[in-house]
Regions:
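N-terminal signal-anchor module of multipass membrane proteins
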Residues: 2-36, 42-43
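Transmembrane alpha-helical segments and their boundary/interface "anchor" motifs
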Residues: 16, 40-48, 59-93, 98-115, ...
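Hydrophobic transmembrane alpha-helices of secondary-active transporters
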Residues: 47-59, 180-187
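Hydrophobic alpha-helical segments with transmembrane-like composition
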Residues: 90-192
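Alpha-helical transmembrane segments
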Residues: 10-21, 81-88, 142-151, 199-204
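Membrane-interface helix-boundary motifs at transmembrane edges
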Residues: 2-6, 61-74, 129-141, 185-197
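Alpha-helical transmembrane segments and terminal signal-anchor/GPI-anchor hydrophobic tails
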Residues: 192-222
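Transmembrane helix-loop junctions and nearby membrane-interface residues
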Residues: 24-31, 57-58, 91-98, 155, ...
Length: 222
């Protein structure tokens, strides 16, 4: 029998999946409207997936090197091997354009389609023991600062300096997503800060919608 809490997280995963589908079926428009705002709201899909992953991984006992190694030996092949297998069709399709060596390197780095998420989650698997040991206040403060600085840096490089950074390079750095995974880990460890979390979540949601609106005034709709 599935526990009630498992149903809850299955529901959240379903919502996140719908958001991902909406993101990848969205067509950019040239003016601000309700569709653009909805598209911006859908951007919480990846953070939601990371928080859910952090919740369950954070419950695991990784206090010793033996337990940590056993966890990695079990978990890494479960996500990395399927990614490599599903990358094969992309390698065959793009063989003439990128060549076998560059194509294989891209595949190993999660560069086929949206597989960057697999590399990202592997990074968090490696960081989980450190996150578990750091106190709530320190982990939230440090992770929030790191994520903020990371986002500012990549926005500067991609939208101001106009560097063409591919998705598998601008999406995989853990520093861009760290705070979301940390929140999940701390929830998984039984720390309760739901009202503070919801207030922060809604603040940044409306801030992102405002950013989209003012950004679109200059004819640049995200």
């Amino acid at each position: 029998m599935i526990k009630e809490k498992d149903w809850y997280f299955d529901f959240l995963r379903g919502i996140a999946i719908v958001m991902v589908i909406a993101i990848h079926t969205y067509v950019a428009v040239d003016e601000i409207n309700g569709i653009v705002l909805i598209r911006q709201a859908m951007n919480c899909a990846v953070p939601l997936f990371l928080a859910i992953s952090g919740y369950f991984i954070g419950k695991k006992d990784l206090s010793s090197l033996e337990k940590y190694n056993a966890f990695l030996k079990k978990q890494l092949p479960r996500v990395y091997v399927p990614m490599l297998l599903w990358s094969i069709p992309f390698l065959l399709i793009n063989f003439r354009h990128s060549g076998i060596h560059l194509g294989m390197l891209t595949a190993f780095l999660g560069g086929c389609s949206v597989f960057y998420f697999i590399i990202l989650i592997i990074e968090f698997y490696l960081l989980t023991p450190i996150i578990q040991k750091v106190s709530l206040s320190k982990s939230l403060a440090v992770s929030s600062l790191i994520t903020l600085v990371g986002i500012i840096l990549f926005v500067y490089l991609m939208h101001i300096k106009c560097y063409n950074i591919p998705l598998y390079l601008n999406g995989t750095p853990f520093l861009l997503w760290l705070v979301f995974y940390v929140l999940g880990v701390k929830f998984g460890n039984g720390v309760s800060f739901i009202w503070w979390f919801l207030s922060l979540a809604f603040f940044f949601l409306f801030a992102s919608l405002g950013e989209t609106y003012f950004y679109s005034i200059n004819g640049k709709v995200a």
